[in-house]
Amino acid sequence: MSILTLAGSPSQRSRSSALLRHAAQLLRARGLGISELGLRDVPAEDLVEGHYAGPAAHALRARVAAADAVLISTPVYKASFSGGLKAVLDLLDDKALAGKVVLPIATGGSPAHLLALEYGLKPVLSALGARHILAGVYATDKQVRVDDDGVSHIDDDVRTRLEDSVERLAEQLRPRGVVVNEAFDLGRLALAGGFSV
């Protein structure tokens, strides 16, 4: 399984990027492969001018196409997700997220900015073909801090919600045959134990 993380902030010390890195660590601990992509990986000129046919845009689309799941993080500015993230999403094909599990992650100044996920980001993800968008993780600036050394401090409540979301994402990526086999094995075990099934 291939998972792509897409950071919608140009700052390495961004709170939303800190949450994204923590989610990636949790997924790596489960043995899942992670590929990271940020705004700095696409030339600013390509983003500003929308160079859809350029080599960076082709590479971006190839990385998204290869992913089974995409985690997208963004800071919320002026009640919407970041313009840099929108510029990246504009370089994708119309159905670039079709068949992929998508987990949105955002941070903002107040709880009121949570609506930016539902009414700002999710409609754009849907327009890109995403049909399996997990409930997003939102945190306020007070709940996620990045110190001068770049070390992230995430409140327990946010950490728990992020871990739950990562668990749901991992469940969605688990091969369906594994679930069927486990159910089959439980049925055989019940029969062997003399239980009627």
Language-model region placement:
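Residue-level recognition of beta-strand->loop/alpha-helix junctions
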Residues: A7, G38, G136-Y138
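N-terminal beta1-alpha1 ligand-phosphate binding loop
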Residues: M1-L32
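Active-site-adjacent alpha-helix of alpha/beta-hydrolase-fold enzymes
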Residues: H22-A29, P123-R131
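Cofactor-binding loop segments of dinucleotide-utilizing enzymes, especially the Rossmann-like FAD-
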Residues: G8-P10, L39, T107-G108
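Glycine-rich phosphate/pyrophosphate-binding loop and the adjoining helix
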Residues: L134-V197
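N-terminal beta-loop-helix "entrance" segment that forms/cooperates
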Residues: E36-A56, R145-V151
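Helix-loop-strand module that forms the ligand-binding subsite of alpha/beta enzymes
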Residues: Y52, A56-G129
